[in-house]
Regions:
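Terminal targeting signals and extreme-terminal segments of soluble enzymes
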Residues: 22-302
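Short alpha-helix boundary/capping segments
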Residues: 2-11
Length: 302
C-alpha cells in the first residue's frame, strides 16, 4: 500500500490538511474557468446541450480534451435512467478545440435495453466536429469483486510536490497533480505514477465524479505514451491525444486523492500507445484506460 493516509470523511476535511495544491499562473487568470463552470451544461432541447470553454486569454492555444470528455460524458449521462452508470467510454479526438468558444453536445440514443444503454455524443464548435464519444451504461449487478494488480508502493501525495512544468498548461490548474516515483528526476519512466484530485470540492453526484475522472485520465496521457527515458529537456515536441478509451470499475470521488499510472507500451511512426490505471488512496482499482497519442518531435514532417 502507498504511504498515503486513508480517505477522510469528507473532501472538505481533506482540503484543510497537507500542503497547498500546485496552483498555476496564467496570462489571464480570470480566463481559466473553475471546474464547476466548465461542467455547467445548458440544455438546448432534443438531447442537445451547450457548455463553455476556457477564455481566449487563458494562456493555451487549444481546449484541453479532458474537459470536453467530461462534458460529453455528463451530456450522455443526462439522457439515461438514474439506475445506470457509465462503465466504458470511447473517444475520438477529431480536431483541436478553440478556447473562448462554447461547445455544442448532441446526444444520440443508440440503445436502451434492460441492463445497458448506449449513447453517442458529437461535440462541435461552430459546426466543426472536435470530438466523438461512444459511452455504455450498465445497471449495477451482483458479481465477483477482485483486482489482479495492487496499487503501487510509492510516496503518498502529501510527500510529493506539484510539478512545475504544468505552467505550460495553465488550464490544468483545476487539478492538483503530483508526479511521484521517478527513478531519475526529469526523465520519463516506463510507468508514470502520479497523484491527482480536483482543487475544488465537487458535489456529491456520482455522475459528476465519474465524468471528471474520465477527463482526468487525459491529463498525463501524452507524456505517459512517450518512450521511457525521454528527458523533458532534450528537445521540443508536439503532442496530442488521438483516441482514448476508459473503463470504470468502481465508484470514486474525483476531489479525493487517486493514484494514476501510465505504462508506455509502444512508439512508432510519431505515435505512442500507453495503458493507464487509477486507484483510490485506500487501494481500490477505480478505472483503466488506453490511449494513442501523436508525438511529433520538432524537426519532423508538418
Amino acid at each position: 500500500m502507498p504511504r498515503a493516509s486513508a480517505a477522510q470523511t469528507t473532501s472538505q476535511a481533506r482540503r484543510r490538511t497537507g500542503p497547498a495544491p500546485c496552483r498555476l499562473a496564467s496570462p489571464s487568470v480570470t480566463d481559466v474557468a473553475p471546474l464547476a463552470t466548465l461542467l455547467d451544461l445548458r440544455p438546448l432541447g432534443d438531447d442537445a446541450f451547450t457548455a463553455p470553454t476556457h477564455g481566449p486569454d487563458a494562456g493555451v492555444e487549444r481546449v484541453y480534451g479532458g474537459h470536453v470528455a467530461a462534458q460529453a460524458l455528463l451530456a450522455a449521462t443526462r439522457t439515461v435512467p438514474a439506475d445506470r452508470s457509465a462503465h466504458s467510454v470511447h473517444l475520438a479526438f477529431v480536431r483541436s478545440g478553440r478556447p473562448g468558444l462554447p461547445v455544442r453536445l448532441d446526444v444520440t440514443r443508440d440503445r436502451d435495453g434492460r441492463s445497458f444503454a448506449t449513447r453517442r455524443v458529437t461535440v462541435r464548435q461552430e459546426d466543426a466536429v472536435i470530438m466523438e464519444m461512444m459511452a455504455s451504461f450498465h445497471v449495477e449487478e451482483p458479481g465477483d469483486d477482485w483486482t489482479a494488480t495492487p496499487i503501487l508502493d510509492v510516496p503518498g501525495p502529501e510527500e510529493t510536490p506539484g510539478r512545475s512544468f504544468l505552467h505550460e498548461l495553465p488550464t490544468l490548474g483545476v487539478f492538483d497533480w503530483r508526479v511521484t516515483g521517478e527513478t531519475v528526476p526529469g526523465e520519463m519512466d516506463a510507468t508514470y505514477p502520479h497523484w491527482v484530485r480536483t482543487v475544488e470540492a465537487l458535489p456529491d453526484d456520482p455522475a459528476v465524479h465519474r465524468a471528471v475522472v474520465c477527463g482526468m485520465t487525459d491529463i498525463a496521457a501524452v507524456r505517459g505514451t512517450m518512450r521511457p527515458g525521454f528527458e523533458r529537456g532534450e528537445g521540443g515536441f508536439t503532442g496530442a491525444s488521438l483516441d482514448h478509451a476508459v473503463w470504470f470499475h468502481r465508484p470514486a470521488r474525483a476531489d479525493e486523492w487517486m493514484l494514476f499510472t501510465m505504462d508506455s507500451m509502444s512508439n512508432h511512426a510519431a505515435r505512442g500507445f500507453g495503458i493507464g490505471r487509477a486507484w483510490s488512496a485506500d487501494g481500490r482499482h477505480i478505472a483503466s484506460w488506453a490511449q494513442e497519442s501523436l508525438i511529433r518531435h520538432h524537426g519532423g514532417a508538418e
